[in-house]
Amino acid sequence: MQIDLNADLGEGCGNDEALLALISSANVACGWHAGDAATMLQTVKWAIEKGVAIGAHPSFPDRENFGRTEMQRDPEAVYADVLYQIGALAAMVRAQGGQLHHVKPHGALYNQAARDPALAEAIVRAVRDFDSDLIFFGLAGSKMIDVARKAGLRVKEEVFADRGYNADGSLVKRGTPGALHEDEEVALNQTLTMVREQRVRAIDGNWVPIRAETVCLHGDGDHALAFARRIRERLGAEGIAVRAGA
């Protein structure tokens, strides 16, 4: 058995180089919610050195709120936003002799697209038009996975180590009870259950089927690095290899 571990990097959290030794895929902020040209280039260099798959992590234009504020943007504007950000990161990857591997939307763009097919279509179209060989990372079982698959893109269904789930498979909204698992053991056990059993316990206590193809480890928490090490150790002990895959 194998699983991909991904993390959102280039967001100014200071753990990036160390985290890259523990993950298999990196989602690099493209400057619209965090980061800038210098952080993008540095993160790309580190990822190439460590053999980590590189993905673009496009956002709504929202640096003030770290890309976590929902917006009602015209689909054509979103298409242009995403295409612009992918292109910027891809240029840096290419200049360093690497190859862009995937695209994962960030924050509010991700969460809205998970339930809004029109928004998802704009994002997916930008990815496909830029490079139809790119892999699309999206919330497991969501509308954006369906849209990406129908558009002919390869997908990876994403689950979250430290986030709570609703009964419909959506993430519990940040700022509400149960949104984040502060207890590392709870997050570790949730991750192993999702990977091995392809299910997750929702906040209402019921089990929800879930397809876990890539696990997101948040890189912006106080204990992000220590938690990533524990995840790697537990996966290794269970005989589960960590690989980006194709």
From Swiss-Prot:
It catalyses: 5-oxo-L-proline + ATP + 2 H2O = L-glutamate + ADP + phosphate + H(+). This is 5-oxoprolinase subunit A. Keywords: ATP-binding, Hydrolase, Nucleotide-binding. It comes from Cupriavidus pinatubonensis (strain JMP 134 / LMG 1197). SUPFAM superfamilies: Glycoside hydrolase/deacetylase (SSF88713). The keyword Iron does not apply. GO terms for biological process: carbohydrate metabolic process. It comes from the Bacteria. Forms a complex composed of PxpA, PxpB and PxpC. HAMAP family: PxpA. One of its GO terms (molecular function) is 5-oxoprolinase (ATP-hydrolyzing) activity. Belongs to the LamB/PxpA family. The keyword ATP-binding applies. Its EC number is 3.5.2.9. It holds the Pfam family LamB_YcsF. Catalyzes the cleavage of 5-oxoproline to form L-glutamate coupled to the hydrolysis of ATP to ADP and inorganic phosphate.
